[in-house]
Amino acid sequence: YRKKQGNQIKERTTLLQETNTKLIDQKEEKQQLIAQNKREQEKLEDEKKQQDALIATIREKESSYAAQINKKQAEANRIDREIDRLIREAIAASKKESGATTNSETEIKKGAMPTFALTPAAKALANDFASNKGRMDWPVERGRVYKKFGTSKHPTLPNITTYNSGVEIETAPGSVARAAFKGTVQQVQLIRGGGYTILIRHGNYLTVYQNLKNLKVKVNDQVSTKQALGEIAENSFNGKTILKFLVYKDSERLNPEDWIYNM
C-alpha cells in the first residue's frame, strides 16, 4: 500500500512540477508579448511624432509658397489694371480724334465696354485681323506656353486659384518678342514689375507684349508681322525668360490661344 501511495505522490508531484513549468512558460511568454507590444507602441508613437513633424513642415512650406503665389497674383493684377488704363486712354484718344464723345449711348448701356472709334482704314485692318483668327504667328520664334489664359487651380494647393489675363510663353534667353500681326505701336510703357510693355493696335483689336527690354520700336511706328519689338527679359519671380502676351478687342480681354496658330 505504502509503495502504491508513494507512486501516487510521485505522480502528483511530477504533474505539479509540469503544471508549474507550463505556468512559468506562459508567464514568460505573456511578459514577452507585453514587452513586444510596448516596443511596438513606442515605435508607433515615434512614427506618429515624425509624421506630425513632417506634416507641420509641409504645411509651413505650403503656407510660405501660397503667400508667394498670392503676392505674384497681386502684382499681376496691378499690372493688368495699368494696361487696362492705357487701353481706356487709347480708346478715349480715338474718339477725340474722330470727334465722337466718350459717353455714347452704346457705352452707357448696362454692361457695355468702351470701344474704339474706327476710321475706314482702321475698320479694314480690324476685319483683316479678325479673319486671321487661329492662324496668326507666334510672338516668339521658338517657345512653349508656360501658363495658359484664364482661371486655374494650383495642382498641389487646392485652396489656391490664380488668374492669368494672357498667356505666358517661355523661350530661350536673349530671344526677342515679335509682332503677331501688322499694326501701329499704340503705347510703350515701363510698368513696375512688368518691364516694358508694348501695345500694338490693329483697328479695334490690340496685342500686348509684356516683360521686354532693349526695345526696337517706339510709339506710332508701323510694324509688320513678325517684326522684332524688343528683347524678352528674365522673369523676376522664377528667373525664366517669359513673354506675357495678351489680346484685346476694344477693352475686352480675349484668349490668345484662340488667335495664334497651334498654341
Feature roles, as predicted:
Residues W138-K147, S175-V185, K226:
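Generic structural motif
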Residues P114-K133, Y146-A179, H202-G203, V247:
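Short glycine/threonine/proline-enriched tight-turn/helix- or strand-capping micro-motif at secondary-structure
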Residues K133, V140, T162-G166, A180, ...:
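Extracytoplasmic
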Residues I198-R201, V219-M263:
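Conserved, short, structured surface segments that act as functional micro-motifs
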Residues K148, V188-Q189, I232-N235:
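Residue-level recognition of beta-strand microenvironments
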Residues Q36-F149:
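Hydrophobic packing segments in regular secondary structure
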Residues Y1-I55, R59-K61:
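Amphipathic alpha-helical segments with strong coiled-coil propensity
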Residues T162, A179-N214:
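Zn2+-dependent peptidoglycan hydrolase active-site motif and core
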